[in-house]
């Protein structure tokens, strides 16, 4: 059915800029955008359903392209200890850190993981998020990684949001493989990835390239295994040190390389040449009180597309608001509100391999958009917290939580 949405202004985000249409109208047909433009040029015809958006600013639905939404337990106690002077090493030695999340996730049932993740996901959805990526990586064995990925598929089936599922088995070394990282990588490549891919649980494969995780050589083995299975790759890279993981990601035409505080200009050039998206995660930068900024000028100079995501996770970015991340990207990384909004729409879509169908408001694309009662698009990165008055449309149908 054709539906007309009118009396609005639109920031289409085509080509990664606002691309504003004043006094606009949008015609949707089923789940797709059939026409968009100035209301004065609206094609004549019958529109069975007409919606008055009352002067709202319409943007594409927000896309959170890097989250770890599904996990067991809670690490707020560790947060408190760190602020009382206990070091991360001491916390880890006492069984805390990522090991505690792995234990809690392994012990939790699928239903328990679903219930806790659904609450977190609904918080993102109330922020205007219509598409989200979720990673495994807190199971670190086949059964537990499968459990997480099954929960991700279930969330996609039961909540009105589009979901991409990423296997991050190469996130950390599980306790049963202590001091045997190469053996664990072998297990991922030979057993875990083929089994999980065969079950249709994986849309992409990620890894953590860092001195406290996996080496570039080990990550490359994961990439080769993923590509043999026809799966695109992504990478956590250059968060804490420079191992040139982002250049490795570019060599394998990764969808994205994420974090990137320690990347250099050569890495930026490599990413530009492969059109690999730089996903910046200001929540983790803020929460860890980091001081090394991503090389914004190099990214801009070489025209690397920049996305912004929440990195929602229990250890380093317990962030339930993507809009807050837009503000942090502006205040911490000195991005403009326009760059930040592109980072949570069209560039985030590219980081998920979805830019042909999502991320901007153009004819033929999926009709996912938000009508915000705001004064200008920059308000999305300006206001800190709180719920903005809005209407959310997903696949051409108004959605509510």
UniProtKB/Swiss-Prot annotation:
NCBIfam families: hutI. One of its GO terms (molecular function) is imidazolonepropionase activity. Zn(2+) binds at residues 66, 68, 236, 311. Keywords: Cytoplasm, Histidine metabolism, Hydrolase, Iron, Metal-binding, Zinc. This is Imidazolonepropionase. Fe(3+) binds at residues 66, 68, 236, 311. GO terms for biological process: L-histidine catabolic process to glutamate and formamide; L-histidine catabolic process to glutamate and formate. It comes from Pseudomonas fluorescens (strain Pf0-1). It is an enzyme of class 3 (hydrolase). Catalyzes the hydrolytic cleavage of the carbon-nitrogen bond in imidazolone-5-propanoate to yield N-formimidoyl-L-glutamate. It is the third step in the universal histidine degradation pathway. Pathway: Amino-acid degradation; L-histidine degradation into L-glutamate; N-formimidoyl-L-glutamate from L-histidine: step 3/3. Its cofactor is Zn(2+); Fe(3+). It comes from the Bacteria. It is found in: Cytoplasm. GO terms for cellular component: cytoplasm. It catalyses: 4-imidazolone-5-propanoate + H2O = N-formimidoyl-L-glutamate. N-formimidoyl-L-glutamate binds at residues 138, 313, 315. CDD domains: Imidazolone-5PH. 4-imidazolone-5-propanoate binds at residues 75, 138, 171, 239, 316. The keyword Cell membrane does not apply. Binds 1 zinc or iron ion per subunit. Its EC number is 3.5.2.7. Belongs to the metallo-dependent hydrolases superfamily. HutI family. InterPro entries: Amidohydro-rel, HutI, Metal-dep_hydrolase_composite, Metal_Hydrolase.
């Amino acid at each position: 059915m054709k539906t007309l949405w009118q009396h609005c202004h639109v920031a289409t985000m085509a080509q990664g800029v606002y691309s504003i249409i004043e006094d606009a109208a949008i015609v949707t047909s089923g789940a797709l955008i059939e026409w968009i433009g100035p209301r004065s040029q609206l094609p004549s015809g019958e529109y069975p359903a007409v919606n008055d958006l009352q002067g709202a600013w319409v943007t594409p639905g927000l896309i959170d392209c890097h989250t770890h939404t599904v996990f067991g337990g809670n690490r707020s106690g560790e947060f408190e200890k760190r602020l009382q002077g206990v070091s991360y090493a001491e916390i880890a030695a006492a069984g805390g850190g990522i090991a505690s999340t792995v234990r809690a996730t392994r012990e939790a049932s699928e239903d328990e993981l679903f219930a806790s993740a659904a609450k977190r996901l609904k918080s993102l959805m109330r922020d205007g998020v219509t598409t989200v990526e979720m990673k495994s990586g807190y199971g670190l064995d086949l059964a537990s990684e499968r459990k997480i990925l099954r929960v991700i598929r279930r969330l996609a089936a039961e909540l009105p949001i589009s979901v991409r599922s990423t296997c991050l088995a190469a996130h950390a070394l599980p306790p049963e493989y202590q001091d045997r990282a190469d053996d664990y990588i072998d297990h991922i490549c030979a057993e875990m990835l083929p089994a999980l891919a065969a079950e249709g649980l994986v849309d992409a494969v990620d890894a953590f390239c860092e001195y406290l995780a996996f080496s570039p050589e080990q990550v490359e083995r994961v990439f080769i295994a993923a590509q043999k299975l026809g799966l695109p790759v992504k990478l956590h890279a250059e968060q804490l040190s420079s191992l040139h993981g982002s250049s490795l990601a570019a060599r394998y035409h990764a969808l994205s390389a994420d974090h990137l505080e320690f990347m250099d200009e050569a890495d930026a050039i490599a990413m530009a040449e492969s059109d690999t998206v730089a996903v910046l995660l200001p929540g983790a930068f803020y929460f860890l009180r980091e001081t090394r900024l991503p090389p914004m000028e190099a990214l801009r100079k070489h025209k690397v597309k920049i996305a912004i995501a929440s990195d929602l996770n229990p250890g380093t970015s317990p962030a339930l608001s993507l809009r807050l991340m837009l503000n942090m990207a502006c205040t911490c990384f000195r991005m403009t509100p326009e760059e930040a909004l592109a980072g949570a729409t069209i560039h985030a879509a590219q980081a998920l391999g979805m830019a042909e169908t999502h991320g901007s408001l153009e004819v033929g694309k999926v009709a996912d958009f938000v009508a915000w009662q705001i004064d200008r698009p920059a308000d999305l990165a300006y206001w800190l917290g709180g719920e903005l008055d809005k209407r959310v449309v997903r696949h051409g149908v108004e959605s509510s939580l």
